[in-house]
UniProtKB/Swiss-Prot annotation:
BP term (GO), one: translation
Any one GO molecular function term: structural constituent of ribosome
Protein known as: Small ribosomal subunit protein bS20
Record carries keyword RNA-binding: yes
Function: Binds directly to 16S ribosomal RNA.
Gene from which the chain derives: rpsT
Family the entry assigns: Belongs to the bacterial ribosomal protein bS20 family.
Cited Pfam families: Ribosomal_S20p (PF01649)
Amino acid sequence: MANSAQARKRARQAVVARAHNGSLRSRLRTAIKAVQKAVVGGDKAAAQATFRTSMSTIDSIADKKIIHKNKAARHKSRLSAAIKAMTA
């Protein structure tokens, strides 16, 4: 239990930050799944368009340090490889 006023305030702020970070993390997972769904669907043009929008989402979440930059790079690399592996 937080005893000092400072600790109580930090606990309140942590609750808000946790909710916000969870929301951003959910956006990340949704963006990744959208690209994967387009790849499975077989439409390369749609997959590329979805990938372009997802890249900015992934980068912005990494910039906010919600995920590590290397994890963001790994996601982008794997999604890009999946799109390149598709037959045109």
